[in-house]
Structures are given as C-alpha cells and as structure tokens.
C-alpha cells in the first residue's frame, strides 16, 4: 500500500543493524558529550576515537565543525534552529548506529529537553550522555576561539554560559571535569564505561 507522502517503507528488506554489527565485530552505541564551549568535549572525543580505533573498533565523530559546515549549514543560532540542529544530528547519528558504527557526538546541547529529544530519537538504550563538567571559569580562561571575550563584549548574543543558560544534565552516564582530570584519565574512565558495551564477546 502507498504510504502518505509517497514513501514506501523498505526496512523489512534491508540488512539489519545486527548484520552490520556482526560484520564489524562490535556493538554500536551513541556517546553524547555535552558541556560548555571550551570544556574539552571535542578534545576528549578525538582522543577516545583514537583509542577505540587502536582496538579495531569503527567510530564516527560528529561535532559543530563537520555538521555546521555541511548538513546544518542553513541553520543559525535562534532557539528554533538550535533545536533543529540537534534533531538532525540525532537522526544522522541513528543512521550511523543502524550501520553498526560507534557514534561520538560533541555538542554544547545546553538544556535537558534538547538532550532528551536526542535520546528519544536515538534510543535511550543506546544513548550514553557524558557531561564534560569543566567550570565556566576554566572554559573562559582557555577561550581558544576567543568566543567568551566576544560574548562578554556583547558581540555574540545568546552565548551559552554568558548570556544563555546551560542546564546541568540530571543523570549523565559519566561526568568529566577536565580542570581536574588529565586527557588520559578522562579517556580511561570513558573506556571503562564504553568497552563492555561495544565489544562483541
């Protein structure tokens, strides 16, 4: 039967996620980093990917640079666009997961509702929320891109942590404060959590 909008489902004829995971020898999960700009999300994500790669595990990192320059290059930073940004990221992440690929996302994703939306799209059993809890003072001190300085001068509106709020996650799978933990320590804690979930026995 023809579905609405002329969409004909073919999912029942496609290779399954389990087939892909068997081929790759891994279980796919979503590792979702949230935290302030400059907290260390992307740095940890890249280091984690390298460690998993060394173990023969296939990963894909999604972050602001590769998403905003591509699939989301038509979105701005209004509240509506921020929600749509995360929705698209979650949908793309779901496709990677269904291909058996361990997916790592590093986005500020500043409130619980937006992260809950992502978890619901991806599937809560697959969604590991990692809160990079580095304090604002430390993030602002680093200010690698000069964004905090611009936000303090009013040159950037609705900047999370300065002129827009960040809601602390209620029940993250893991919290990492990079002002107290080294990169190696952060990655080791992640590996302790992640490896039992992704390695096929």
Curated annotation (Swiss-Prot):
InterPro entries recorded: APS_kinase, P-loop_NTPase
Active site: 109
Catalytic activity annotation: adenosine 5'-phosphosulfate + ATP = 3'-phosphoadenylyl sulfate + ADP + H(+)
Keyword terms, alphabetized: ATP-binding, Kinase, Nucleotide-binding, Phosphoprotein, Transferase
One Gene Ontology biological process: hydrogen sulfide biosynthetic process
Protein's UniProt keywords contain NAD: no
Residues that bind ATP: 35-42
CDD domains: APSK
Enzyme class (EC, first level): transferase
Superkingdom of origin: Bacteria
Pathway entry: Sulfur metabolism; hydrogen sulfide biosynthesis; sulfite from sulfate: step 2/3
Any GO molecular function: ATP binding
The enzyme's E.C. designation: 2.7.1.25
HAMAP family: Adenylyl_sulf_kinase
Family, as annotated: Belongs to the APS kinase family.
Protein function: Catalyzes the synthesis of activated sulfate.
Protein name: Adenylyl-sulfate kinase
Species whose genome carries this gene: Bacteroides thetaiotaomicron (strain ATCC 29148 / DSM 2079 / JCM 5827 / CCUG 10774 / NCTC 10582 / VPI-5482 / E50)
């Amino acid at each position: 039967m023809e579905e609405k909008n002329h969409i004909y489902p073919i999912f029942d004829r496609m290779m399954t996620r389990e087939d892909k995971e068997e081929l790759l020898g891994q279980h796919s999960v979503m590792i979702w980093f949230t935290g302030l700009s400059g907290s260390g999300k992307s740095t940890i994500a890249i280091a984690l990917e390298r460690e998993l790669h060394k173990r023969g595990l296939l990963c894909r990192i999604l972050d602001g640079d590769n998403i905003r320059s591509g699939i989301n290059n038509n979105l701005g930073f209004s509240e509506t666009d921020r929600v749509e940004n995360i929705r698209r990221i979650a949908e793309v992440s779901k496709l990677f997961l269904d291909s058996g690929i361990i997916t790592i996302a590093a986005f500020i994703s500043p409130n619980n509702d937006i992260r809950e939306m992502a978890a619901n799209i991806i599937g809560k059993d697959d969604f590991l929320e990692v809160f990079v809890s580095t304090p604002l003072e430390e993030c602002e001190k680093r200010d690698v891109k000069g964004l905090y300085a611009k936000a303090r001068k009013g040159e950037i509106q609705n900047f999370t942590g300065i002129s827009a709020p960040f809601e602390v996650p209620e029940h993250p799978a893991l919290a990492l404060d990079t002002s107290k933990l080294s990169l190696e320590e952060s990655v080791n804690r992640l590996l302790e959590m992640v490896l039992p979930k992704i390695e096929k026995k």
